[in-house]
A protein has these predicted regions:
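C-terminal substrate/ligand-recognition segments
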Residues: 353-427
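An aromatic- and glycine-enriched ligand-binding surface/loop that stacks and positions planar moieties
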Residues: 23-86, 166, 194, 198-205, ...
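Long, intrinsically disordered, low-complexity segments
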Residues: 21-22, 54, 62, 66, ...
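Short coil/turn linking the two alpha-helices of tandem helical-hairpin repeats
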Residues: 156-157, 163, 212, 237-244, ...
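Conserved, well-structured interaction surfaces
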Residues: 47-51, 55-56, 83-159, 183-195, ...
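Bacterial N-terminal signal peptides
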Residues: 10-19
Length: 514
């Protein structure tokens, strides 16, 4: 059962690097800045502050369903969206989306990162006797460091080079130099951003403890395994962006192995657990979760299911969740899309149980089949309308299957086919897919791992990032060498960000296209 308290806290609204004017630099002056001796005086207030950081990160990724635009639609694996805005991406690889400026704006990420950094600075100075124990103080510091790391990692995957802000922005005075000029923060090389994120992840690992499935905050707040999962992702992304950096590959192997051995999490056996196991995974806080965005009506952390294109349920669901078939927004399982073609032509996939668990009527009617990972809901008791439903599906960020397949990829990069295939087969076995018998060369293994990740994490906004990290673009017709040479796989920076901070340079591919 989901059991996290919902907190509200007025926090710094960081407009440095964002789109706000100087006059509204601080949307609301926070009590933590105005009266630090009053606010930072108890564990309860520190807990409230950390809850605010989680909330800011949640806002950054779910605003206008941006997490799907960044990590799912760009992957082009299973769902062909009927939505005209998504078609900018699917049709021509155009990331300059109509009515979706937020997808190019990193403002919300910096709000989350700056607040997390601020929390770290203040909690560090709080005496231990303000907390129940040193362990509790460390936990809160570790969770704040985790959010800061996760936020910068997301920005690195979306934009590549981004500014690093290593100070708590508490006053507009901090944005003015001694000479009276506005302080400008230029974009920093992607690998430096990853180093910064990795440093914060390691800090988090050192401060947090492992948790246990069934614990009240399991998977919806960070524990040591959450931070190790984040480190695994950062390290392998780093390796993929730095010519198979051997140190980073090994760090990814070590981090994934630690999660697998120590997290207490276990895989969902789709064959034996069936729909019950699938539902538990999607609703959240299941035995396989490592970190998730909490969606719960009981704790005022939900929203009504609506057939609109500004939320992830509207963009992924269809009848009978909706009262009638939606042919204007909902996606369909295009047989020509990479993942659907793979499932249809690979004989090993004939009895893959995920086709029936993950999708509604997969293979029966491609036009009306849809992903079911965001279909879980509860009735709005205040309404007599049977279709007045609150979402109850968590957004899964890290889970245990991810660790097995990341480790498989890391070993494939080292050309260690044995352990790579072993981890690949562990995931296949849970879905009634026979052991892998294909080629053992790196290229063959990387394709097999990408394919497994494509079906296992469909809808979880992984495939777009997987393509960049693995440099694998089969099935994406608008990707070419010339585009990639100019880093066209990254998203453009919103022009208003650049106009307010001239030291920010647009990504080469997008120059002249906005």
């Amino acid at each position: 059962m989901k059991q996290i308290k919902s907190f509200k806290i007025y926090i710094v609204v960081l407009c440095l690097l964002g789109s706000a004017s100087c006059s509204d630099l601080l949307d609301q002056e926070p009590i933590s800045i105005t009266h630090p001796d009053v606010f930072w005086d108890s564990q309860a207030n520190a807990e409230q502050a950390v809850a605010g950081a989680y909330s800011l990160f949640k806002e950054a990724i779910i605003t206008q369903s941006n997490f799907l635009y960044w990590g799912e639609w760009t992957g082009m694996t299973f769902m062909n969206s009927r939505n005209w805005i998504v078609n900018y991406i699917e049709g021509s690889g155009n990331y300059v989306l109509a009515y979706r400026d937020a997808s190019m704006n990193w403002k919300n990420f910096y709000r989350a990162a700056n607040w997390a950094y601020t929390i770290e600075q203040y909690i560090e100075d709080m005496p231990v006797d303000m907390f129940d124990s040193q362990t509790e103080k460390d936990r809160l510091l570790g969770e704040a460091a985790f959010i800061r790391s996760l936020t910068y990692f997301y920005m690195a995957r979306i934009w590549g080079d981004v500014p690093i802000v290593e100070q708590s922005i508490e006053s507009s005075d901090q944005l003015i130099s001694e000479d009276g000029y506005i302080v400008e923060n230029a974009r920093v090389d992607e690998l430096q951003v990853l180093d910064y994120a990795l440093e914060a992840a390691n800090k988090s690992i050192g401060l947090l403890q492992y948790s246990t499935p069934g614990a009240s905050n399991w998977a919806i707040t960070a524990n040591k395994a959450s931070a190790e999962a984040l480190k695994a992702h950062i390290s392998l992304w780093y390796a993929g962006r730095d010519n198979d950096n051997p140190e980073m590959i090994q760090q990814a192997i070590d981090a994934t192995t630690s999660v697998i051995n120590n997290s207490g999490a276990s895989l969902i056996d789709y064959v034996n657990e069936g729909k019950e196991g699938f539902d538990e995974m999607c609703i959240g806080q299941s035995k396989t979760g490592l970190f998730e965005i909490n969606i719960s009506a009981d704790m005022n952390e939900s929203f009504r299911l609506l057939q609109y294109d500004d939320n992830h349920t509207g963009l992924t669901l269809n009848y009978p969740v909706w009262q009638s078939v939606n042919t204007g927004i909902s996606p369909y399982m295009d047989p020509d899309f990479y993942g659907n073609e793979m499932m249809a032509t690979d004989a090993d996939r004939a009895n893959d149980v995920r086709k029936d668990l993950f999708f509604y009527e997969y293979g029966t009617n491609a036009d009306y089949s849809y992903l079911q990972k965001y279909s879980h809901s509860t009735q709005d008791e205040a309404s007599e309308d049977a279709y007045a439903q609150f979402s109850e599906s968590n957004i899964l960020i890290f889970r245990l299957a991810d660790m097995y397949l990341l480790r498989a990829e890391a070993n494939a990069r080292k050309e260690l086919s044995g352990p790579a295939i072993s981890d690949l087969n562990e995931i296949r076995s849970k879905a009634n897919v026979p052991d892998y018998t294909g080629g053992t060369d790196r290229e063959s293994l990387m394709k097999a791992i990408f394919d497994e990740r494509a079906i296992e994490f469909v809808g979880e906004a992984q495939s777009g990032y997987d393509r960049i990290r693995m440099d694998y673009y089969d099935g994406v017709p608008w990707v070419n060498q010339a585009r990639n040479a100019k880093k066209g796989y990254f998203w453009p920076v919103l022009p208003s960000v650049i106009s307010r901070n001239p030291s920010i340079l647009q990504t080469e591919y997008w120059r002249g296209k906005l």
